[in-house]
Amino acid sequence: MKKGFFATAAIALALVAGPARALPEFTTILLEKVVDRTPDQTWAKIGPYCAIATWLKVTCVVTTGNQVSVGTVRRLNGKTDEIIVAATPYSYTYAQPMTDVQPQSPIFYHGTLAVEPLDRGRKTKIVYTLFYDQAPLGTTEAKIANRQQRTKRFSDALDAMKAMAESP
């Protein structure tokens, strides 16, 4: 009798608790590119929240906010929403929230675009940081492939940003 009760209780607990979730496996990709322009000149070209349309080759529409303040939301390619969660005069950090067009990202994705002065402000370093949980990607091979894809895509974006910033 006791064994049956404990077995039933264990099954009920498992059903209520739901499936076991993997522990997060956070990773960061940090990319940098030096630009032969001042931070003001660089940020004016690459910093507007929908400038991403040019340097990442996506469509972009601001659906909420003013492009510079915390709480501003942009929609990329009509399906991915990104909300500014922090901002300075030369940076912003965004996250991908749960919305009606996008279920919550299982990888807890965040990105930061920033520019930093170099050579007493005569040059600029563009810094792009990606932060996400790679655990939901599953296998080691999938994690490596995803990281390589993100690194390539955003390295290409940095090259495009450099060209934009240095153009007349």
For the regions a protein language model found, what residue spans apply to each?
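A short, structured loop/turn motif at beta-sheet edges
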Residues: 36-40, 84-90, 114-125, 167-168
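Hydrophobic ligand-binding cavity/cleft-lining segments
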Residues: 18-65
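Extracytoplasmic/secreted envelope proteins and their assembly/folding machinery
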Residues: 39-49, 81, 112, 151, ...
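Hydrophobic pocket/interface hotspot
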Residues: 42-45, 52, 84, 94, ...
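Bacterial N-terminal signal peptides that target proteins for export
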Residues: 1-9
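Glycine-rich portal/gate segments that line the openings of hydrophobic small-molecule binding cavities
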Residues: 34, 51-54, 61-108, 164-168
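Beta-strand/loop substructures that line and gate deep hydrophobic ligand-binding cavities in soluble
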Residues: 101-156
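Bacterial N-terminal signal peptides
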Residues: 8-16
